[in-house]
Amino acid sequence: MENINWNYPTTIWFGVDRIKEIQKACEELNIQKPLIVTDNGILKTNIINKLNDCLDKQAIVFSDVKSNPTGKNVEDGVKAFNENKHDGVIAVGGGSGMDTGKAIAFMAKQERPIWDFEDIGDWWTRANADSIFPIIALPTTAGTGSETGRASVFTNEKTQEKKIIFHPKMLPSIVILDPNLTIPLPANLTAFTGMDALAHCLEAYLSNIFHPYSQGIALEGIRLVKNNLVLAFNDGSNLEARSHMLASSSMGSIAFQKGLGAIHSLSHPVGAIYNTHHGLTNAVFMPYVLQYNKKGIEEKIVDISRYINLKSATFNNFMDWILELRSNLNIPHTLSEIIDNDKNLEKMSSMAFNDPVSYTHLRAHETPEHRGWRRLLGKK
């Protein structure tokens, strides 16, 4: 697959070994002293060493980032950023590393706490937009799509809630999509992150918000997942499959400008309380949410089925594909296989009901006292 540059929604350099152009990216953004932000899992690979080898000067690395990052992770990163007088961030990793890196560049000179910039109304206008430092993103997973997003998700450890922090300038200025960086990803994380990409594209397509641009991107993203995720899972060295999955991941993040839904609003509280992998919980909830919403989404599911070339363009056949895909990826069938979902059922139901992405879930407010949410969370 040839190297190519895209300019939507930001500058994207796509292709094998494009990590070697990191110094050029820094120069284009006038970053002279970048802080590399990643997680400890990435440190166990040679990716950061390879990245530093491509820079004129060795960069300091901040890696105190949890798999479900917290506000404290951002605070510590901001401290490191300011103490060492950095002037930009290179965010490397999956969603945790990229979300944290973006937030560090955003928060470095803000005077308000991070929770004051939650994605509610015009709260983003509270920020000093002129003080946000430039960001370069290098994803090492194909799932979260944080590299093409204007938001980051963090757990507030005091309230055990996941919060979406948003600002238009949190969108990285340059994204390097190098499929070689996803080769070290183990099979289970390939599955989890790939299902996250599918959830983004699927929920975006099914959202009731009018956004035809995102609609088209979401549809093609679903097709790329169908044709490539199992290939990448079975053979992590399959560079073509890795390339297509990396593209679908970024496409999913672009698409969900149209909205998400109950898969994500259910996954957020589970991850906040039990620290589960976000993509895994999305994958577990997916068929239950689709079945629950069947009446309102069946026509769109038929359209998807036809586009991705399923043998029969029906809702039931699409569900069969989702279940088969989960089975091929060794995804647990029920939530009770990964958590004890009885202990915090009421709390999680309330959190899901009030999650900001639930507003595009077709039956979000249909049942009183969160009965619908309890029903989905209580699946055995």
Named regions from a protein language model:
Residues M1-G88, L335:
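ATP/NTP phosphate-donor binding region
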Residues Q23, N52, E75-V78, K102-A105, ...:
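Predominant activation on well-ordered alpha-helical scaffold segments within soluble catalytic domains
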Residues K72-K79, E83-L177:
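Glycine/threonine-rich beta-strand-loop-alpha-helix active-site module
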Residues G143, M251-T276:
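Glycine-rich phosphate/pyrophosphate-binding beta-alpha loops
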Residues A151-K258:
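Carboxylate- and glycine-rich phosphate/diphosphate-binding segment that chelates Mg2+/Mn2+
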Residues I273-L345:
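Gly/Pro-rich interdomain helix-loop hinge
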Residues T360-E369, K380:
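Conserved small/polar residues in nucleotide/adenosyl-binding loops
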